[in-house]
């Protein structure tokens, strides 16, 4: 299932997600203040972001010519992080027209790793690094 062209994913080879559960109970939670380094060389505190925002969180993105971790495809939901980023890229203007103020990707990879990915995939939004797991521990 390994895909070589990570900037133009073959969606037919990405496993379909299982039905999502109702997550409405999460609306009562507030994001705590944590500064996360972004690919546009700024620190972002998600607790201070105003307006409608999308934060998509993913485990990792692959890099060309580098193998994924062993058994990566066996982890439910692990496959598809790069296509997910591409989908937000491809629908960026639509989301902006729907009054989405901010879009952020977020992973535990380093900012340098993420910068390579944002440049290669031509992402029009910043990706945030939680390398120290400060956001994840909330």
Regions flagged by a language model, labelled:
Residues 1-138:
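Chalcogenol-based redox active-site neighborhoods
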């Amino acid at each position: 299932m390994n895909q070589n062209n990570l900037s133009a994913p073959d969606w037919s080879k990405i496993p379909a997600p299982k039905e999502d559960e109702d997550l409405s109970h999460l609306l009562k939670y507030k994001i705590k203040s944590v500064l996360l380094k972004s690919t546009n060389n700024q620190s972002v505190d998600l607790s201070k972001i105003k307006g409608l925002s999308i934060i998509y969180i993913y485990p990792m993105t692959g890099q060309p010519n580098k193998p994924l971790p062993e058994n990566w495809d066996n982890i439910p939901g692990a496959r598809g992080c790069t296509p997910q980023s591409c989908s937000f890229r491809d629908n960026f203007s639509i989301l902006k027209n729907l009054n989405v103020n901010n879009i952020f990707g977020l992973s535990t990879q380093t900012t340098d790793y993420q910068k390579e990915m944002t440049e290669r995939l031509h992402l029009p939004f910043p990706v945030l690094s939680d390398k120290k797991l400060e956001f994840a521990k909330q």
